[in-house]
Amino acid sequence: MAKTSTSVIAAKTLVHAAALAPIALLGWQFWQVWQSGSDALGADPVAEIEHRTGLWALRLLLITLAITPLRQLTGQAVVIRFRRMLGLYAFFYATVHLAAYLTLDLRGFWTQIFEEILKRPYITVGFAAWLLLMPLAITSTQGWMRRLKRNWGRLHMLIYPIGLLAVLHFWWLVKSDIREPALYAGILAVLLGWRVWKKLSARQTTARRSTPPPATPR
């Protein structure tokens, strides 16, 4: 038991390090640009910051959605312990993504966000995804699970439309080459399709068990 706990702690430490590595690298490169005007973030540093943080938010969201299929395929229930932290990191990167847009792109004129939401569909769906993520992040604790009871599970089913909105945000943002958003759309389709298939299979199994056997002729 102690060995398992130690392994989980070590694995969580690695996950934390891996999840924080992209933002640490981005922060270091931003510092270089700020201090020396280097091209560490390319010709358009603001666009690069927004792109990377948004991309990692989407990646971590998809990894979070992959936890349940991974548990079902491997039978390793321990992977569920990583779902909450991965989901919180997805929200963290999404928040940094939004903050970068507000502070670096809009340059602090935050009231323009409402005009942008109405004018640009990709911002509309992206902002909607972030708003839906917020209650999931807030209620991710054990205390909220106890308070909400069955409603907690219903609330956290919002992760599915959030995934769709996030992919759609990326798809609409890209103007020409849609190969990358198409890849993430395909991954999301597989993850959601797996859940639909498992649910239908469970219903069929339940129906077969509840169907009485045919009467034998006397």
Swiss-Prot record:
Q: Where in the cell is it found?
A: Cell inner membrane
Q: Which GO terms describe its molecular function?
A: electron transfer activity; FMN binding; heme binding; metal ion binding; oxidoreductase activity, acting on diphenols and related substances as donors
Question: How is its cofactor bound, per UniProt?
Answer: Binds 1 FMN per subunit.
- Tell me the membrane topology, using the record's own terms: Multi-pass membrane protein
Question: What top-level branch of life does the organism fall under?
Answer: Bacteria
Q: Does the keyword Transmembrane apply?
A: yes
| InterPro entries given in the database record | Fe3_Rdtase_TM_dom, MsrQ-like
Biological process (GO) annotations held by this record are: protein repair
**Residues passing through the membrane, by range:** 14-34, 60-80, 86-106, 121-141, 155-175
Q: Which GO terms describe its cellular component?
A: plasma membrane
Question: Do you know which Pfam families this protein is assigned to?
Answer: Ferric_reduct
Ranges in coiled-coil conformation: none
**What are the alphabetically sorted keywords of the record?**
Cell inner membrane, Cell membrane, Electron transport, Flavoprotein, FMN, Heme, Iron, Membrane, Metal-binding, Transmembrane, Transmembrane helix, Transport
Cofactor(s) required, per the database record: FMN; heme b
| Protein family according to the UniProt entry | Belongs to the MsrQ family.
HAMAP family reported for this sequence: MsrQ
NCBIfam families to which the protein is assigned, alphabetical: PRK05419.2-2
Subunit and partners? Heterodimer of a catalytic subunit (MsrP) and a heme-binding subunit (MsrQ).
What biological function has been recorded for the protein in this entry? Part of the MsrPQ system that repairs oxidized periplasmic proteins containing methionine sulfoxide residues (Met-O), using respiratory chain electrons. Thus protects these proteins from oxidative-stress damage caused by reactive species of oxygen and chlorine generated by the host defense mechanisms. MsrPQ is essential for the maintenance of envelope integrity under bleach stress, rescuing a wide series of structurally unrelated periplasmic proteins from methionine oxidation.
Name of this protein: Protein-methionine-sulfoxide reductase heme-binding subunit MsrQ
Protein source organism? Xanthomonas axonopodis pv. citri (strain 306)
Q: Which gene encodes it?
A: msrQ
